[in-house]
């Protein structure tokens, strides 16, 4: 049921799913099926590698990376991992000792990985965001917002809907309207009906609400401030586009890596961090206050920009070529 099992074949590539799952850290007894699935995944990975005969195997940190890269290494195939977060997951830490190269998105990763293998490449982002040619006026028009909008808040509730962020926005719609804030609100599918009902009750608020934003380039260009979870790719986009942001890390991710990502920015003045537990009370009031301080927003965006690594995909490809001896 995972998205890639549908989208990868549609893009013209074969995909093989592995039955591997993560460990249950609260109830070790539930890990017996996990061990069985790991063995199945190793067997399937070995068969797939033998059939496909790749020149290199690349892992991006998910549990499925472990059996694939382990079997590739046994077969003498070069391996590379990419760590997207500021705090690596268990899989990449286990694989790091035997891979050829480690591409990272944050500085100071020597505490987790062998220093001689680390290359700072950044995280690849969507091509339409790397090469934007959109004016703010065009972006505002795209969302059918008033042309004079000068305090635009972009809220990214996630494709599935981050309930805490959405609830925080919903409970402060009148405050946003009274502060003269214009809202672009991506709710995710699970929250869109509730959000539309709430918006209808505050007609004085200038707002574009949708479950999914197709043109994120327009959304980022329009925004004066972004509210988002702290996933690796969202942060990479925010940094590359030099956007000031308030990050609300999801508490429901392995090893709390979103909090660590957000702290990596907040300690450098590149974002503000509000915890999920604090969000309903603090998130929108702080956003309203921040939008009244354009100079501080500019400074925050510039600090975020210093953490960006443009052309990350090209950097990673270059490392692949080096591992394969195609480029030195």
Task: Tell where the protein language model's regions lie, with residue ranges.
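Conserved nucleotide-sugar phosphate-binding/catalytic loop shared by glycosyltransferases and other
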Residues: 1-37, 42, 189-191, 276-277
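Glycosyltransferases and closely related glycan-assembly transferases
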Residues: 44-58, 64-80, 93-98
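C-terminal alpha-helical cap of glycosyltransferases
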Residues: 309-328
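Donor-nucleotide binding loops and adjacent catalytic segments primarily
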Residues: 7-11, 134-226, 258-262, 267, ...
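A short, well-ordered alpha-helix in the C-terminal region of glycosyltransferases
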Residues: 296-310
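Active-site-proximal region of nucleotide-activated glycan assembly enzymes
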Residues: 3, 14, 73-136, 145
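Acidic donor-binding loop of glycosyltransferase active sites
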Residues: 54-56, 221-236, 243
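A short alpha->beta transition loop at the rim of the catalytic pocket in nucleotide-sugar-dependent
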Residues: 76, 217, 224, 242-244, ...
